[in-house]
């Protein structure tokens, strides 16, 4: 074997040894993130007047489902405003499957954030103290297509995006973690399970499906939208 052949063989051996270990670590981190945060994630089931095209598994007359996050204090959820802004009523489904009526406390259309009190004790999600850096690993916990809460993972594609054109006031974290209809209002978390953003928008020109350019409202902007008496 010549020198080039030896170099190639050595490189292949290193890749074989390192990549499975890296993949295993990523899977472990995702499991840890899920374990830390999933107990704070709710399915949101709005009913919109005159809606004729229910989401997967939704009763006739209801709108496509969304997601909500327990935050700050027991009994308070946050979701995307566009999930509930047209709703005549809103139900949520807890992590253990209990279905409850929720009320809409406040809607901030400028930031696409809404707050929902629910009549039970909830486990608020931990909040990240710092904005994640570009390239940092993150996971999205959401109710994609109304199928129930699940997890997808990726990286922060950009730590701060403004002027995208979805909302009047924007402070987005961009990610390639998979996001789809039903994910709105879900949690973008770090690998410790701490909230870094509220899933809000999918950038696509052809259909409402994931192409890897997705946006979450930063926790800083989300908290600015909270009514004063709840801060």
Predicted regions and their residues:
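C-terminal cap/linker of serine protease catalytic domains
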Residues: 27-36, 44, 48, 140, ...
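Gly/Ser-enriched beta-turn/beta-hairpin loop segments
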Residues: 53-61, 105-112, 159-173, 205-209, ...
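Catalytic nucleophile loop of clan PA
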Residues: 69, 178-199
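Bacterial N-terminal signal peptides that target proteins for export
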Residues: 1-11
